[in-house]
Each structure stands twice: as C-alpha cells, then as structure tokens.
Amino acid sequence: MEPSKVYYTDFRCPVGTSLLEKLRRVCIAAGIKDIDMDGRFVAIKMHFGELGNLAFLRPNYAKVVADLCKEQGGMPFLTDCNTLYPGSRKNALEHLSCAQLNGFWPMTTGCQVIIGDGLRGTDEVEVPVPNGEYCKTAKIGRAIMDADVFISLTHFKGHESTGFGGALKNIGMGCGSRAGKMEQHAAGKPAVQEGLCRGCHRCAKECGSDAITYNAENKAGIDYDKCKGCGRCIGACSFDAIYSPNDCANELLDRKMAEYAAAVCHDRPCFHVSLVQDISPNCDCHCENDAPILPDIGIFASFDPVALDQACVDACLNAAPLPNSQLGANLAKPGWNCYHDNFKDSNPNIEWKATLDQAEKVGMGTRQYVLKKV
C-alpha cells in the first residue's frame, strides 16, 4: 500500500489569521471538498466532553467543519453515542444536556446534535466487520450508520487504557452502542449491583435471552448460562444497577476497537480531522482533566485514519514533556524506569501500538504516511 497523505498545520497564528481559518485551510487542502455531500446526511463524530472536563474540543471547531459540509450541499449533524458507565452521558436526555452545557447546540455549531444510539443506548445496527479477527459484527449507533458521509473530528490526547485517544478510538469506541462498548471493554457478561436495583423489571423486559430473574427481595440477578453478553440490559437500567465487571486486557480492547472503527467506515465516504492540543493524560470521559502532558502541536487531516493517528502519535513522541504534568512528574521520580515513550511514561501500564497494528491488518489504512505542511 502506498503511503497516505496527512496534512498538518501548527497553532501559530499571524496577526489577522485565526485557528478556525487554519482548520478550514487544512480540511480543504486534505480534500474535504472532493466528497460529494450534496443532499446527503453527514455525521460529524466527536466527543462533547463529560461535565466538569474542559479539555474537549471547542464548539467553534465543529462549526468550521459543519459549515464546510453545508457549503457543499450536505446536511451535517454532530453525534456521539451514550456511555457504558454512569455519568452525564449515559442516556440521550442527559447526553444532550451535557452537550448543551458544554456549548454544543445549533447557534454555536451551525447544526443539530443527534445521539447516535438513541434514548437508552440500545438503538443500534449490527454491522459486518471487514476481515474481522476478534469481532465478526459491530454494534453501532443507528443514526451514525444511517448517515451517507462520515467525518471524525477528534481531540487527540493520552488515555489511561489505550495509551492515546485518537481518530480510531473516537470512531471505534465512540460509535459503539452501549452493548458495543461492552463488547469492546469487557470479557463478556454484565453483573448486578443489588443495592442500586429498584426491582422495576425493565431489564428483564429488554433481555432477549430470558436470562434475568429476581430474588425474594425483588433484586435482579443474571443467569449466566442463558446470558449472551449483549449488554442490552445495561442500557435498559435507569439506575446504573447493571454494569460491566470484567475489563479485558488492554491489547484485546485496542484490537476490538480498531475492528469497530473499520466497520463504521467501510464502504462510504469518510474524512478525518484531529486536533493535537490540550493533550491531557486521560480520556475526556472523566469529569476532570489533568494538566497537559505535552505542548499543543497542531491540526492534522487525512482520508486515512490509520495514517492520521500514526502521524499524531509520532508528533507526540517527538515533543518535549511538560514538567507540571503527570508525564513530567513520572519522569522526575527517582529511579523511574524511563520508556522513552511519552504515552507509556505517562500511563506505564498500557500498550498503544495494537490499535494501529490491527487497523492496518483489517485494511482500514496504512501506518505509512507523507506529512504535508499547510
């Protein structure tokens, strides 16, 4: 496979030129206007940030991308899917409120916000995974798969489970329904925290395997001989009583995530933009954000999300760590076993290369790229 083109600009702005204009230039240089969007629905997949977190991308960036789509006759909408865990984004009502409180609504972004997997995180489509090794199908939010064109707009950062959070994570994990997220994150089957169960029986009604029973105290329990591990009961519960107890090894998570991303992008026009700024050590899913581990680097865009992530990773690995950060503090510890890898030195119990390896393996793109400065 030939190296892919990745377009890049830094964050330096001469007088009279804003970062929003630089983002627009990078998108155009990378070929966003080559996509036929006329009369088509365009899903712009991004992360709206957990309440309390301030590292997520500003709504102004989303408006630049949405405006470019509308200029080409497209009908864009911002989207993300509900979270597997408790928080402010576990159902569509709370998720929309969170997005609005963080600044994402039509007056600021120029388009609507649609939660991709519906009210409870159960509105999903089972999509074939091309060349899937770990997942033969992926459970993806229906609204995302209904779109004619797919664009990822990613805040590139560190991550406590996957090493870094880039385009592949934004697409693969982010587009998964709650059941899809569980399939990626967990070894299999959910569990019940009895103290939170209200005995409403909603989970039993949602279960297609007749795997949920109730004890004498009217608390739910799961028959693991019948349970298929689909995760739909998690979405059905309004009280966070059903949860995923068993995280897989990080490498398996990384590889499943890459395959989910391949399912989302297969056989339709896709474009990818990543902003490498406010590089926090952990995910924007936290209700806080620690100090950036690296200085702001730039804006990257490409048709190839694998090459895009690799280019962003390389830029981060070549950047100087910031002293007042998780990374800087680790490196300053006496006797620290330095990995000479800014992601592993920030979160030493992770391995980030598997995501890129698996995405390349299933034919989503190539890790080889040519960087073109805009």
Predicted segments, located by residue:
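Extended, low-polarity segments enriched in aliphatic/aromatic residues
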Residues: 2-61, 71-80, 85-374
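Terminal amphipathic helices with adjacent charged low-complexity linkers/tails
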Residues: 66-67
